[in-house]
Amino acid sequence: MGQKGCPIGFRTAVTKKWRSLWYGNNQEFGKFLIEDVKIREFLKKKPSCQGAAGFVVKRMSGKIEVTIHTARPGLVIGKKGAEVESLKAELKKLTDKDVWVEIAEVKRPELNAQLVADGIAKQIERRVSFRRAMKKALQSVMDAGALGVKVQVSGRLAGAEIARSEWYKNGRVPLHTLRADIDYATASAETTYGIIGIKVWINLGEKKAVPAANHAGAASTAAA
């Protein structure tokens, strides 16, 4: 089953932390979940968040805290913090709640699956050969110290009439092993022939289980 399921969801609360941290009763849960999705979709479209690797949403008594994980913190912060203040104002308007924005820098972007997938997508959109983009990504990930990496692209590759999938793999990527720290992400490239889907798996080694205190007693959700 590890081959078919999402590696992140498969390991959530085992070796992966929740991406949304809050409690909601039966009446609030659906509302909070939809609000989380709106926040993420809004941030993904912002130019200042283009280098973002992910978002964590935390709720505390009428207040929302959004942590943006990015390889380019200066772009998100803006000149004298202007961009962050703008994000706060727009998110407050979207949610009708006070929103606090935190910035967390991704120290090693070559080992972040989302940033690698986005990089491949941008290259394909610039008409770089998909095979060249995939092989270059594999090499940079392995050079950064990963134990294994797998990259898959799907769609009308190189303008072919029939859609297909191709993948390259280097090293070990054990999808069934729960203690294996597998980072996984998807991205899409918009081309003149249609949408090209990209999937990236990166094996970062073995990891200890997440402490129970991080998820005990919380009806959290791992919305992407």
Swiss-Prot record:
Q: Which PANTHER family match?
A: 30S/40S RIBOSOMAL PROTEIN S3, SMALL RIBOSOMAL SUBUNIT PROTEIN US3C
What the entry lists under Pfam families is as follows: KH_2, Ribosomal_S3_C
State the coiled-coil residue ranges: none
UniProt-recorded name of the protein: Small ribosomal subunit protein uS3
Give an example GO molecular function. rRNA binding
Q: Which UniProt keywords apply?
A: Ribonucleoprotein, Ribosomal protein, RNA-binding, rRNA-binding
Annotated family: Belongs to the universal ribosomal protein uS3 family.
Organism of origin is: Chlamydia trachomatis serovar D (strain ATCC VR-885 / DSM 19411 / UW-3/Cx)
GO process annotations (BP): translation
Q: What does the UniProt function comment say about this protein?
A: Binds the lower part of the 30S subunit head. Binds mRNA in the 70S ribosome, positioning it for translation.
Under NCBIfam families, the record lists: rpsC_bact
> PROSITE patterns recorded for this chain?
KH_TYPE_2 (PS50823), RIBOSOMAL_S3 (PS00548)
The record's Gene Ontology cellular component field reads: cytosolic small ribosomal subunit
KH type-2 domain: residues covered? 39-107
Highest taxon listed in the record's lineage: Bacteria
Which proteins does it associate with, and in what oligomeric form?
Part of the 30S ribosomal subunit. Forms a tight complex with proteins S10 and S14.
